[in-house]
Design a protein with these regions (language model features):
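N-terminal type II signal-anchor transmembrane helix
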Residues: 1-44
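Small-residue helix/turn framework positions
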Residues: 17, 60-81, 103-130, 158-165, ...
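Short extracytoplasmic
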Residues: 41-67
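Phosphate/ribose-recognition catalytic cores of enzymes acting on nucleotide-derived substrates
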Residues: 84
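An amphipathic, basic-hydrophobic helix/alpha-beta surface used to engage anionic
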Residues: 87
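A glycine-/polar-enriched beta->alpha junction
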Residues: 91-97
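Intrinsically disordered, low-complexity segments enriched in small/polar residues
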Residues: 128-148, 313-339
Length: 458
């Protein structure tokens, strides 16, 4: 036994000694041309290694790259397909002997990736994805079963991505998006334990013209099978600007506890959930189950919201056209998406302390929505509505090919004058209104609604 230990100790010392001496003797930069030649043969692309290559073997097996780029595919832009200013990754040597993998913090700086699709629908990475047609002697050999490391035996010191940029240019659709300044930093990855995550990036779009800045942080827990993600203390901030953004600019701040489960059909929960935007604060919870055929639940409340701020505003051309002639909508157009309604499974409650819509103000607003098996039911109420109140219920039954609609509404003690002033800017009449309506109809077009309309209103 003693002799065996001496032999093993000698081998270990020999390996360690070689690992220490090798990087001093071997310069990876001497193999720069060979590496570039192999890449050219395998991909047809030019690999440019303009910076130094570094190599270490003990106590970490590591490699470092500086200023490396890969040329674009033939027929696309002259800019490189990919470029990296600096990359470093290291694996600890001695733990490998006991089948444990310890990876240092993975560092990636200044990465640029240009993704393109031409008018024919071909992308600039198609040539990299297609397998080689050359015969491979190893393809006919049976694949041997190899032992795999359990994820618990792998430890990663963290991830650091600095100033990454990705461009997407689709000539077939006229789309152009840029993801710029991506910074991602994580703590050490330990499955089952919280890992701090910080992410920041900016997305630019040409059509529609918009810019969105994103900042995300929190503690992420990942299970050993990588199908459950628990994001604790998650904070997301979005700064959006552009023609499609209400008022031209908007900031959204969201805090939540997010749990995503990709097993058993998948689920996503946000509980609790708080969203701040403009002068409003939305709070509550939301969940989605079974991604293939979603079941959605929510319970949300907002303190105050002006929905007119988020309604699309007519352009100058549209406003001019409306003053000259108003074209009625096509009468035969289907108004209810029957199949979509049949597929929906939604149950939720929305409340607002104060809500403005089309200039009208309501307080203590509530909407209860249930959609299941092709039947949509909405119960809505406004407890304070121009010195009165409003309650209503709407049912859309799309189980048959011809939808059926039932509407019941009751308005009590509404002061007409201030309501019409808010709605129209003036009020030719005054007084108090009490209205009760119970209406039914069938069909899916305006003429069908009018033809089948039945009920009372008083």
């Amino acid at each position: 036994m003693g002799k065996l230990l001496k032999i093993v100790s000698g081998l270990v010392l020999l390996i360690v000694g070689a690992a220490i001496v090798a990087p001093r003797v071997i310069d990876p930069n001497d193999y720069r041309e060979q590496i570039q030649t192999v890449v050219k043969e395998k991909t047809g692309r030019d690999l440019a290694i303009n910076g130094d290559l570094s190599l270490s073997l003990f106590p970490w097996i590591g490699i470092g790259l500086n200023d490396v780029s890969l040329s674009n595919a033939v027929g696309f832009k002259a800019a490189p397909f990919a470029k990296i200013q600096e990359a470093n990754v290291k694996v600890k040597l001695l733990p490998l002997l006991s089948q444990h993998v310890e990876v240092s913090t993975v560092i990636l700086k200044g990465m640029s990736l240009n993704l393109e699709k031409n008018q024919a629908g071909k992308t600039n990475w198609d040539d990299l994805m297609h397998p080689s047609t050359e015969p491979n002697a190893t393809q006919d050999k049976p694949i041997e079963q190899s032992s795999t490391l359990a994820m618990g035996a792998i430890a990663i010191g963290g991830l650091q991505i600095v100033d990454a940029n990705i461009t997407w240019d689709d000539a077939s659709k006229g789309e152009h998006y840029t993801l710029a300044g991506l910074d991602l930093t994580t703590d050490a990855l330990s499955l089952g334990s919280p890992m701090g995550v910080e992410l920041a990036l900016t997305v630019d779009s040409r059509k529609p013209k918009a810019t969105v800045g994103l900042k995300l942080n929190g503690d992420l827990v990942i299970n050993s099978t990588f199908d459950q993600f628990d994001f604790q203390g998650m904070t997301l901030v979005l700064d959006a600007a552009g023609n499609a953004v209400p008022e031209g600019a908007m900031t959204i701040e969201m805090t939540s506890h997010l749990i995503a489960d990709l097993s058993d059909g998948g689920s996503l929960t946000l509980n609790p959930l708080t969203i701040k935007f403009d002068d409003s604060t939305l709070s509550g919870n939301a969940a989605i189950n079974h991604f293939a055929k979603p079941s959605i639940q929510f319970d949300l409340a907002v303190d105050a919201i002006n929905l007119d701020r988020y309604r699309p505003k007519p352009t100058d051309t549209e406003s001019s056209a409306q003053t000259t002639s108003v074209a009625p909508p096509p009468l035969a157009v289907a108004l209810i998406p029957v199949q979509t309604l049949r597929d929906l499974n939604i149950e939720g409650i929305f409340k607002a302390q104060s809500l403005i819509l089309k200039g009208l103000t309501g307080e203590e607003v509530s909407v209860k929505l249930v959609t299941k098996n092709g039947v949509l039911k909405s119960e809505q109420g406004v407890k304070k509505f121009y010195n009165g109140s409003y309650v209503g219920e709407t049912v859309v039954d799309a189980r048959q090919n011809t939808p059926k609609i039932i509407v019941t509404e009751q308005v009590t003690n509404i002061n007409i004058e201030p309501l019409l002033i808010d709605l129209l800017g003036e009020s030719p009449i005054t007084g108090v209104a009490n209205i009760t309506a119970a209406l039914t109809t069938r069909g899916n077009t305006v003429p069908a609604f009018k033809s089948a309309l039945n009920g009372t209103a008083e």
